[in-house]
Amino acid sequence: MKDEQHHNQLEDDEDSGRAAAECIEIEPDFLKKLRDMTVNKNVEEMRKQRKNAVYIAGRLALAGQITVFYAAPNTGKTLIALKLISESIANGTAGENVFHINLDDTFDGLIEKADLANRHGFYELGPDRFVKPDENLRELVERLVNEDSARKAVLLLDTVKKFVDVMDKKASSNFMTICRRFTAAGGTIIALAHVNKKKNDDNEGIPAGTSDILDDCDCAYVMHALKDEIGPEGKWRTVEFLQKKARGPVVPEAIYKYHINHNDYSQMFNSVKLIEGDEVDRVRQQNAIDSEKAHDLEAIEAISSELDSSEPKTQKDILEALGQLGISRRTLIDCLKRWSCAQEDGGLWQLTRGDSNSNCYRLLD
């Protein structure tokens, strides 16, 4: 019995030895294959292909990266993106292979963008070429990567929701994997996406969908309209880009403005301009004033209805007249004080002194 056990043990030891020997023989081959998969041997070639801080859209997007612009509808994300990319084409940084994949537009809109494309050197692709956008994008990326053409191309994806269900975490992750495959081969992607209807506590847009697109991109901005104003040339919209994520020397924020003309897209396109220097401070100050006025709107409208620009009214008379509106006395007094300042600071009425040193107010001219 002992001899049989000893014999079995010897057989087990021999089997273990053979298995170990096989592992020793197999492992070096596999490790060599694994080493061959690494980028170490290609680093010099990759360095030659690397794009050193080449700006593709103003100073908001870098070549070789995935950049996402989030904005609500009618903010101007397509307009501004096309303008900035066209400037990069003109100065030679974007190359000759910029493709606007426009899946979120009307027939007339496609014609307008195609006219711009012909004038400014980019290429317009519409829904007829992307019947199944997710599959078509994957096929396009695979073809460009396999032909070593990705590094020569810029893709403007308009909009992300046409390529993927942004509420589907797995689908969003797969979409970003496709985008990463493209940029890992040297390509550049600028993707336009939407924000939720509900804003955050700072009144800023919240990227729509799961976090995967924001998590997996290189750079992202949330755009929001600061204000619309009427000037000698018509209505102008001012838009701010606020950075949510960055890899590389892109700006943390930027402000652009454009002339709103729904009858002439090319005129709107040509009007887009960057706001710089002192004008940035003025825009930010005005935006802060507008935000405060929006908070005080009910009280401002009530007080304004009681005042005129000729005869001042005492604070006591104003409060008595507005006493039945349901606005608290403290809110009205604070509003009277807050907006009795110079017009350049947002002032709405003038404070003067009446009998017995009483506070009197009249509308500013």
Which residue stretches match the model-derived regions?
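Helical mechanochemical/support elements of P-loop NTPase systems and associated helical scaffolds
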Residues: T106, L110, N136, A171-I178, ...
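Conserved inter-motif catalytic segment of the P-loop NTP-binding fold
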Residues: A57, T93-S173
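Generic beta-sheet signal
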Residues: T67-F69, V98, A153-L157, I189, ...
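Phosphate-binding/switch region of NTP-binding enzymes
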Residues: V68-Y70, N74, L79, S173-M268
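C-terminal regions of RecA-like/P-loop NTPase motor modules
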Residues: K2-R35, D148-R151, E229-D365
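Conserved, well-folded catalytic cores of nucleic-acid-processing
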Residues: E87-N91, A117, F163, F182, ...
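The Walker A/P-loop phosphate-binding site
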Residues: C23-A117
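Structured loop/turn residues at beta-strand edges in well-structured enzyme cores
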Residues: G64, E96, A150-R151, A184-A185, ...
